Amino acid sequence: MVHCAGCKRPILDRFLLNVLDRAWHVKCVQCCECKCNLTEKCFSREGKLYCKNDFFRCFGTKCAGCAQGISPSDLVRRARSKVFHLNCFTCMMCNKQLSTGEELYIIDENKFVCKEDYLSNSSVAKENSLHSATTGSDPSLSPDSQDPSQDDAKDSESANVSDKEGGSNENDDQNLGAKRRGPRTTIKAKQLETLKAAFAATPKPTRHIREQLAQETGLNMRVIQVWFQNRRSKERRMKQLSALGARRHAFFRSPRRMRPLVDRLEPGELIPNGPFSFYGDYQSEYYGPGGNYDFFPQGPPSSQAQTPVDLPFVPSSGPSGTPLGGLDHPLPGHHPSSEAQRFTDILAHPPGDSPSPEPSLPGPLHSMSAEVFGPSPPFSSLSVNGGASYGNHLSHPPEMNEAAVW
């Protein structure tokens, strides 16, 4: 015996209906809401049968205005993600039914104000704010009230408009004459991506571009304008912080470690007690204390160093056995004298057993040394403690080269 799925009684009729793979009496297949018989088409939810209208009314899209279901045959209007009946899609101030493509302002996601009422209320609020003693509020919220050329001048004033729109009501009594701010606007991720892409292309968009963005994102033009102003202000702050950070990095960066001076010197440089000091090889009475200025009765020149270690380095042009090589050019402004001739006579005829590789010095050196030394003592009184090869005639020229350094 077959039982009905609706009334649970056995089916004794000649005809039966098969719905949801179950057997039904013909009279039991009816809408659970309006009790109308369902002969051609039916809808089911949780084991219950519905007609088309009741099913969409109960489980279909709800109208954001009246919170009632929307029938498939009803005409609707869509604003952002909300769907409205035609009769519910009206201005909250003048109750005018809004048409498709008409500019409007959305409040609390489900209330609308037409453009005419919004602009008229904004102008009234502007006049009240001009006559009010309280200052500091934005002059106007109209998208046409400001030109993009004036945006930068008012970036700092309107940078916090979107952040302060949902503020507390503590100052309402003090700002009765001032314009009231609208609700806080929440920008969704897709809308934010569109605004960022537009900002990357044009940081300061024109009114026409803002109108296009308003149509694409569904945001009103004032919100878009304030967003661009805040974005430009943020970019300027980030550039200032990055420039300040670069200057701080350049100022506080770690200094280079100083390398030892000896490692960078050439082998011929004169460093006291250094690895290549020539004075360590010629420890004689000539370099003893007070012996540096035997040829200078008046003392050393004031501009020269006081010790041999302070002498500048003179590259050697002679053989490697001499501490300092000979100079090939005289100092400018010096001329030969009678004392220079004495040097020439002595140095031009060295002894035959002299080991010096330089039998004579060039003439320009003698003219320079005569001017530098002044009156010269006899060469017979000079002796070098370096060995027997350095005779009384001063066949080796290191002393002459030493004097030439001064």
Curated annotation (Swiss-Prot):
It comes from the Eukaryota. The gene is Lhx1. Residues 4-54, 63-117 form the LIM zinc-binding domain. Interacts with LDB1 via the tandem LIM domains. One of its GO terms (cellular component) is nucleus. Residues 352-362 have a biased composition (Pro residues). The keyword Hydrolase does not apply. One of its GO terms (molecular function) is zinc ion binding. This is LIM/homeobox protein Lhx1. The LIM domains exert a negative regulatory function and disruption of the LIM domains produces an activated form. In addition, two activation domains and a negative regulatory domain exist C-terminally to the homeobox. Residues 151-167 have a biased composition (Basic and acidic residues). Keywords: Developmental protein, Differentiation, DNA-binding, Homeobox, LIM domain, Metal-binding, Neurogenesis, Nucleus, Phosphoprotein, Repeat, Transcription, Transcription regulation, Zinc. Potential transcription factor. May play a role in early mesoderm formation and later in lateral mesoderm differentiation and neurogenesis. It comes from Rattus norvegicus (Rat). Residues 137-148, 315-327 have a biased composition (Low complexity). The modification Phosphoserine is found at S162. Residues 128-189, 294-372 are annotated as: Disordered. GO terms for biological process: anatomical structure formation involved in morphogenesis; anatomical structure morphogenesis; anterior/posterior axis specification; anterior/posterior pattern specification; branching involved in ureteric bud morphogenesis; cell differentiation; cell-cell signaling; cellular response to fibroblast growth factor stimulus. Residues 180-239 bind DNA. SMART domains: HOX, LIM. Its main location: nucleus. PANTHER family: LIM/HOMEOBOX PROTEIN LHX, LIM_HOMEOBOX PROTEIN LHX1. It is found in: Nucleus. Expressed in epithelial structures of the embryonic metanephric kidneys including the ureteric bud and its derivatives, and coma-shaped and S-shaped bodies differentiating from the metanephric mesenchyme. In the adult brain, expressed in the adrenal medulla, Purkinje cells of the cerebellum, hypothalamus, midbrain and pons. Also expressed in the adult testis.
